[in-house]
């Protein structure tokens, strides 16, 4: 009975990290439990209904969940909790949406009292039509997304089996010459295609773009791809031309600068959410063609207005790609209802073990503020506090020491405050990429960095998303936006790309001791711990010692 896990009746799970079975246990509970806190020795997970439903949709059943809890638990698992897990998972799929030859879209139940209960809800009434028989009610087709959101909030997630329109056919094949989809990418495509719609969770660097290409090859239809920014749009285009039968002319870019609508169109979230006089002129892009597949890249960053529109796209196949289902705004349930449940997830560590991602060494370096800085920090206004501790002069010394230590290796210095980055750039004699850097200059510097012409690059937040800097071996983070976990995932993903020479990747986070900087850092580590990375904490003095 000496397992690594303590299961508590409030649905929190405590995992003892140093236990020999901790790693196996983490793999077993990862599909259904969400990590909440991850300090050094004990990690806290929580079991939520949404987590259980996502697991259910990805093909895990209640028996597996119960087995995992019982097998690894140190003490007997509270019986009520096991019953609750089974009942919660059993709620998924008691209501199904499907097509009806006469009535169009219908909601059917296998459990009549559930239908009675939800039909009494004032929120459901306007979304449904006539009662066809005791177990079936008609739903207005335009409310397909809305009713799924509403039912989820009521605790009865509906399984959507209403099928999809095929969209306009367009020939797309994978051009597998000298390469092929990796086993987990194939499984991800199959999981998605079988489920029809939903989210594939894969770490950065594990080739999410190829999963997208695989899905497009299955759909063989016109495709709309939504990405975070223009650079990322160009990367998708480059990758698709290389890996599929598509040509440059078949792929359009719909961004701030270009408005091309082609059989495969890549649009940025930014352009879709641009408002003019309170309306979103570009949202009609969704209706501009009969799309057979819509791909949402980095689905955890999907802006709220796009959700509203996605609710109307329920008849189209939707594939979400992401490294994390955690959203900073807590709208995970909308991803579940509107894009679809999780269809596949591969733990980073397993992919790493297959050699597809270079294993990373994550280190937090704690620096002390000088006496005058501590005084300034103590008397700073609350909103200025983070800036004060994030830009301490000691961080510069540590960064310089680290850059020196890894001289000759491709090193990224990442931060948020422009003046801090400019100063670092000057001291390290390295170019700085920031918000105002033109796209052209940005691409030029990235290329120089890729080819190894420059080995140190200082980047501000702009480099966070979907930009391939394949040969960065070392990342040094000096300041970041207020401890967002998503950001940590993106940043780590930048460096964790597989290295041609099997080099180990290093990720350093430079943090000011005893300040809110340290609290934010703790928040960000959660994500890394969730993925099974060890996070060492070292003192700056040790690093600076000759």
Residue locations for each model-derived region?
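Walker A/P-loop
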Residues: 195-216
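Conserved SF2 helicase motif VI
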Residues: 202, 325, 482-507, 524
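Conserved helix-turn-beta segment of the N-terminal RecA-like "Helicase ATP-binding" lobe
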Residues: 231-257
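Post-DEXD/H (motif II) to motif III coupling segment of the RecA-like Helicase ATP-binding lobe
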Residues: 292-293, 300-363, 528
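A short beta-strand element within the Helicase C-terminal
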Residues: 458, 465-480, 506-509
């Amino acid at each position: 009975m000496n397992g690594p896990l303590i299961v508590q009746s409030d649905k929190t799970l405590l995992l003892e990290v140093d236990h020999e079975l901790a790693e196996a246990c983490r793999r077993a509970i990862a599909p259904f439990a969400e990590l909440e806190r991850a300090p050094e020795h004990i990690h806290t997970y929580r079991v939520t209904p949404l987590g259980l439903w996502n697991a259910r949709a990805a093909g895990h059943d209640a028996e597996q969940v119960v087995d995992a809890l019982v097998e690894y638990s140190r003490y007997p698992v509270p019986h009520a909790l096991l019953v609750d897990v089974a009942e919660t998972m059993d709620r998924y799929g008691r209501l199904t949406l499907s097509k009806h030859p006469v009535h169009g879209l219908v909601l059917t139940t296998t459990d009549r009292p559930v239908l009675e209960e939800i039909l009494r809800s004032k929120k459901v009434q306007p979304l449904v039509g006539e009662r066809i028989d005791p177990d079936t009610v008609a739903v207005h087709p335009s409310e397909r997304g809305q009713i799924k959101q509403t039912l989820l909030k009521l605790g009865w997630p509906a399984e959507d089996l209403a099928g999809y329109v095929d969209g306009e056919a367009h020939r797309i094949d994978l051009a597998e010459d000298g390469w092929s989809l990796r086993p987990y990418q194939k499984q991800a495509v199959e999981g998605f295609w079988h489920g029809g719609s939903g989210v594939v969770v894969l770490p950065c660097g594990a080739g999410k773009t190829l999963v997208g290409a695989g899905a497009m090859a299955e759909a063989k239809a016109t495709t709309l791809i939504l990405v975070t920014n223009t650079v990322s749009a160009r990367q998708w285009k480059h990758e698709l031309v290389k890996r599929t039968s598509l040509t440059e002319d078949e792929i359009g870019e719909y961004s701030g600068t270009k408005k091309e609508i082609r059989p495969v169109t890549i649009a940025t979230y930014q352009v879709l959410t641009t408002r003019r006089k309170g309306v979103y002129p570009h949202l009609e892009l969704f209706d501009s063609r009969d799309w057979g597949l819509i791909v949402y890249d980095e689905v955890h960053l999907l802006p709220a207005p796009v959700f509203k529109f996605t609710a109307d796209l329920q008849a189209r196949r939707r594939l979400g790609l992401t490294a994390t289902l955690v959203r900073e705004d807590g709208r995970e349930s909308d991803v579940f209802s509107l894009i679809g449940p999780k269809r596949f997830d591969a733990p980073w560590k397993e992919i790493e073990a297959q050699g597809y991602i270079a294993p990373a060494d994550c280190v937090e370096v704690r620096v002390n503020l000088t006496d005058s800085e501590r005084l300034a920090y103590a008397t700073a206004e609350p909103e200025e506090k983070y800036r004060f501790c994030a830009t301490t002069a000691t961080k510069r010394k540590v960064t310089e020491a680290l850059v020196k230590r890894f001289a000759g290796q491709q090193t990224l210095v990442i931060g948020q405050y422009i003046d801090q980055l400019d100063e670092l750039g000057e001291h390290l004699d390295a170019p700085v990429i920031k918000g105002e850097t033109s796209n052209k200059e940005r691409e030029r510097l990235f290329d120089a960095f890729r080819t190894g012409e420059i080995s140190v690059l200082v980047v501000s937040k702009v480099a966070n998303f979907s930009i391939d800097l394949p040969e960065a071996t070392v990342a040094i983070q000096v300041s970041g936006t207020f401890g967002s976990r998503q950001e940590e995932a993106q940043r780590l993903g930048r460096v964790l790309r597989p290295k041609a020479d099997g080099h180990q990747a290093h990720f350093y986070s430079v943090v000011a001791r005893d300040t809110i900087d340290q609290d934010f850092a703790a928040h960000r580590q959660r994500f890394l711990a969730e993925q099974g990375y060890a996070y060492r904490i070292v003192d700056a003095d040790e690093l600076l010692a000759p």
